[in-house]
Regions:
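Short strand-turn segments of transmembrane beta-barrel domains in outer membranes
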Residues: 116, 128, 133-161, 171-172, ...
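Conserved C-terminal beta-signal and adjacent last beta-strands/turns
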Residues: 196-199, 488-578
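Flexible loop and strand-edge segments within Gram-negative outer membrane beta-barrel domains
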Residues: 177-190, 197, 201-276, 388
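Gram-negative outer-membrane beta-barrel transporters
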Residues: 289, 294, 328, 422-424, ...
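Extracytoplasmic beta-strand/coil segments of soluble accessory domains associated
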Residues: 45, 49-85, 89, 107
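N-terminal periplasmic "start-of-domain" segments of outer-membrane beta-barrel proteins
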Residues: 8-44, 67, 75
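Outer-membrane beta-barrel signature, preferentially recognizing the C-terminal barrel domain
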Residues: 221-242, 272-274, 358, 371-426, ...
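Short acidic/polar hinge/loop motifs at secondary-structure boundaries
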Residues: 86-113, 131-134
Length: 578
């Protein structure tokens, strides 16, 4: 049987080649980031909140400092990509979302839920977040400015150039706030250049980006009035050779200046400088009408110089291969494996088996088993201060993920899906202690098991409007030594649900609203409401955004308060010149 055919979204995350979303044999959420609706979001992480399986643990607004978790995994077990290139930070997973990605350049965000180490290597235990940009199709200039309570002052600039054979996307962003309370101010600057060229060999993409964030960090990592400044630089080039081969190389530099007492930096100050080099080559070989073999290799090198961690390096190299059997509208089966070698010829083997089958034109079943791993960060290995201590003998985390799902599409504009999953971890890394008076120490847990369910309904309405309802429930079991207190593993959402609507109303206004309810382990449920309204047409587009509309008091990281009701209003100017 053949499934219904409509305009299908193409996905590139969790798969070795682009496939229609309806044909994917993995659990993937695609969050559109159309240019029209970007005016109703402040930063790229806002799109992640539309999937309740993604838990953002923010220490401030507008992605000043945010941890990301998928399916109950901790902050270091989610891999962050930009156009398929790794952005994860080997100093600490707290910086994985410290990215210079401009929201103006996004086309969509793809979220792979479940293990992804067979394709991507270390860190993809809980899942993968891939921010995807798109070359511009027209030449335009966009200017946006806005102000709000808590001293919010924001500006965005974008220049788009589209010519035959090449395009350019230049952006610059500024975000200031005096803070909603003492020592919670922030200043953020970023700029990026995305160049795209089409030639005889194939396509060439050059990505250049930088960001500078300085922010008050009161209570971020303990009962201290701290301050932090993080800078990030990223450069990458990607070259395709027809449709069968791709190569890429990237460089990332990240600096972190941390002051424990903001007004007394001489007491305790850390300076970290991390540099990462990465390269990869992938090739596709057709073995028949429905069979494709994918293979490739990648390597990376990390070097850190730190006043606290010392000087350390880490090199990795990997080879992978996968055979894909796929008949569109009937079935898919993928068998993959990856061998990764690191530090002293130690190695990790990560196999996976995934598949799907159409039972009827409206019903698809899919499932899979996959292995993932994560190498300890430099902070987990070597950090030390009065409150936290690393352990140089930590072992890599291991995880096996299992899932089964059903997708029902009774009509082109209506979809329901439910997924059952379990992740069994071994040597999970967390900070533990026996009493509040002791220091947190990085330790391997023997076993940890996460079991959960995801269910969602998506309904496309007339007038380019869409309504989604989604829920994720989790249960976590672990066996630490009796009497040990956990710092991160226990901070997961037991229940998380969301209702999201966006579309045009009255023919002239864009409306976006989200109602989310979340209950963390051991805590009470709380409600967060977001609302955004903007003019849909014209060169001048006023807008207003409301965050935490109900003025809920809540914490996503224990001990770190989040802002109350926030109102931001502004105007965007669009000028097209071709």
């Amino acid at each position: 049987p053949s499934p219904p055919r409509s305009t299908e979204t193409i996905v590139v995350t969790g798969t070795y080649e682009p496939v229609p979303l309806g044909e994917s044999d993995r659990s993937i959420t695609v969050v559109p980031a159309e240019k029209e609706y970007q005016i109703l979001f402040n930063d790229p992480t806002g799109f992640l909140r539309l999937d309740p399986s993604v838990d953002l643990q923010a220490r401030g607004p507008n992605n000043i400092q945010t941890d990301v978790s998928i399916r109950g995994a901790h902050y270091g077990q989610t891999l962050v990509l930009w156009n398929g290139l790794r952005l994860n930070d080997t100093q600490t997973g707290h910086h994985n979302l410290d990215t210079p990605i401009p929201i103006e350049s996004l086309e969509r965000v793809e979220i792979l839920k479940g293990a992804g180490s067979t394709l991507y290597g270390s860190d993809a235990s809980g899942g993968v977040v891939n921010f995807i940009s798109k070359p511009p199709e027209t030449s335009e200039v966009h200017l946006r400015t806005s102000v709000g309570n808590f001293g919010i002052n924001q500006q965005h600039f974008q220049l788009l150039l589209a010519r035959k054979g090449w395009t350019e996307d230049l952006t610059a962003d500024r975000d200031f706030s005096s803070g909603f309370r003492f020592d919670r101010d922030h200043r953020s600057l970023s700029a990026a250049s995305l160049s795209h060229h089409t030639g005889r060999l194939g396509t060439t993409d050059v990505m250049l980006a930088a960001s500078d964030r300085a922010y008050g960090a009161d209570q971020f990592y303990g009962n201290y009035p701290s301050w932090e400044r993080a800078k990030s630089w990223f450069a990458a080039i990607r070259q395709t050779f027809g449709s069968s081969m791709e190569t890429n190389f990237s460089y990332r530099r990240h600096t972190d200046l941390f002051v424990l007492y903001r007004d007394r930096p001489e007491l305790f100050t850390n300076r970290h400088v991390l540099e990462t080099y990465q390269g990869a080559a992938r090739r596709r070989l057709s073995l028949g009408q429905n069979t494709t073999f994918h293979y490739g290799t990648d390597a990376s090198y990390d070097a850190i110089r730190s006043s606290n961690l010392g000087i350390h390096t880490r090199g990795r190299a990997a080879a992978f291969g996968a055979i894909d059997f796929r008949a569109l509208g009937r079935f898919a089966l993928n068998l993959g494996a990856r061998e990764e070698v690191y530090r002293g010829l130690r190695h990790q083997f990560s196999p996976s088996v995934t598949g799907s089958v159409w039972i009827s034109p409206k019903l698809k079943l899919r499932g899979g088993v996959s292995h993932a791993f994560r190498l300890p960060s430099f902070t987990e290995l070597y950090y030390h201060d009065a409150a936290n201590t690393g352990s140089p003998d930590l072992k890599p985390e291991q995880a096996w993920s299992y899932e089964a799902a059903a997708e029902w599409r009774p009509a082109d504009r209506f979809q329901v899906q439910t997924t059952l999953f379990q992740r069994r971890e071994h040597n999970n890394i967390d900070y533990v202690r026996q009493s509040p008076d002791e220091t947190w120490r990085a330790t391997n847990f023997r076993r940890l098991r996460v079991t959960g369910v995801e269910t969602g309904l998506r309904r496309s309405l007339r007038g380019n409007r869409e309504l989604t309802l989604s829920y994720t429930g989790l249960r976590l079991r672990t066996d630490p030594e009796p009497g040990l207190l956990s710092k991160y593993a226990s901070n997961y959402p037991v229940h998380s649900g969301a209702v999201h609507f966006q579309g045009m109303v009255g023919g002239v206004l864009l409306l976006r609203t989200r109602f989310g309810v979340l209950q963390r382990n051991g805590g009470d449920p709380y409600l967060l409401c977001e609302l955004g309204v903007a003019r849909a047409y014209g060169s001048l587009r006023p807008f207003v955004q409301f965050s935490n509309l109900t003025n809920t008091g809540y914490q996503e990281v224990p001990g770190v308060a989040m802002p109350g009701r926030t109102i931001t209003a502004g105007i965007e100017i669009r000028i097209r010149f071709n």
